[in-house]
Amino acid sequence: VAQTVSDSLYKRADRLIAMSEPLQKRLIARTGKPEKDVAVISQYCEDFYAVPCPDPDLQARFAGRFNLVFTGTMTPAQSLDMVLQAVLDARNAGAENLHLLLVGDGMSREALQALAEELHAGDAVTFYGSVPAEKVPSFTTLADALLISLSDSPDLGLTVPGKLASYMAAGKPVIASMNGAGYEAVKESGGGLASPACDQAALTQNLLALYRMPAADRAALGARSKAYYEAHYRRAELLRRL
């Protein structure tokens, strides 16, 4: 019933906005509207994510490590158990200073901490806990790379997560383990390395590749991420397109 009602409303609208190309295609198929009447406008990113915010205490605490930073909610949808195992695999393959810094909380945190103990992860992972959104740039500034991961679900691939936009705003390389629109955005941006959702071996190889990459090449990835944010996710640009 809900879909029938929503489809009816969609068909009556003069124009529709989809947050990604996959959603645009779905709306076109459900409504029969021409492509010109279904615009693609991504979710914007708040401007403060684009401002570097060095924190001397954080930098001192995590100095000497290759910091792979994840920010946000920890649920089964993020497949962080697979990520943790990929990080340990990469460390065993030579990325000995690789460090997974998890900033956030959620229903999966206790299970992840138990898994870390079971796998003897030790100092390979830090569970930092939740911080206010305005504090997140302190962690993205610290990061050598920023991690986004999603489980293998068709619905999760329909949109580009807002987190990816905030990562690109930070101007750091992105390590993505996901399918769909987010995967395609990372590939198109040239600002990071992307592997299919839940592919532990592929994620491990991308972690090793980024770890071994010259610093100048990693900086170039970050610059491309920033440029993609400016063109696609900056609030002022999206409001202009509206």
What are these regions (language model features)?
Residues 145-148, 166-177:
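Short hydrophobic beta-strand element within catalytic cores of glycosyltransferases
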Residues 59-88, 101:
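Conserved donor-binding/catalytic core segment of Leloir-type glycosyltransferases
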